Amino acid sequence: MGLLLLLVGIGGGFGAMARFALTQATASISKQIPLGILLCNIIGSLIIGMMAAFLIETKLFNEDVSTYVRFLLVTGFLGGFTTFSSFSLDILNLLQRGEIFIAIGYIWLVS
């Protein structure tokens, strides 16, 4: 538990710094639309879906390494990078488990 918490913290810190850097870099492009956050959410959600599929479909990592990679990169970095990726992953997991009505209810409650 302690190592996983540390991995999430390290990944989350770097993800938050990356989000801050992207929002600062795009701040002068658009004053009306929060372009940086929009890009973070789009990029992060795309990567989180690709990482989830990659970790599920490939046998590149054993289960222990896959867990560490997931906590560092998906939960940590992408969770810190986006404000939407954790929600997307929750919906993806519910749909993969066949819990369609719970996923719809979750979307309705959060929206």
UniProtKB/Swiss-Prot annotation:
Q: Which chain regions cross the lipid bilayer?
A: 2-22, 36-56, 71-91
The places in or outside the cell where this protein is found are: Cell inner membrane
Matches recorded under Pfam families: CRCB (PF02537)
Q: Which domain of life is it from?
A: Bacteria
Q: How is its activity regulated?
A: Na(+) is not transported, but it plays an essential structural role and its presence is essential for fluoride channel function.
A biological process (GO) annotation for this entry? cellular detoxification of fluoride
- Provide the binding site for Na(+): 79, 82
- GO molecular function terms attached to this record: fluoride channel activity; metal ion binding
Catalytically driven reaction(s)? fluoride(in) = fluoride(out)
Regarding the membrane, this protein is recorded as: Multi-pass membrane protein
Write out the entry's keywords from A to Z: Cell inner membrane, Cell membrane, Ion channel, Ion transport, Membrane, Metal-binding, Sodium, Transmembrane, Transmembrane helix, Transport
Would the keyword RNA-binding turn up in this protein's UniProt record? no
What cellular component GO annotations does this protein have? plasma membrane
Q: What does this protein do?
A: Fluoride-specific ion channel. Important for reducing fluoride concentration in the cell, thus reducing its toxicity.
Assigned protein family = Belongs to the fluoride channel Fluc/FEX (TC 1.A.43) family.
**Name of the featured protein:** Fluoride-specific ion channel FluC
Can you name the source organism?
A: Francisella tularensis subsp. holarctica (strain LVS)
Highest classification ranks of the organism: Bacteria, Pseudomonadati, Pseudomonadota, Gammaproteobacteria, Thiotrichales
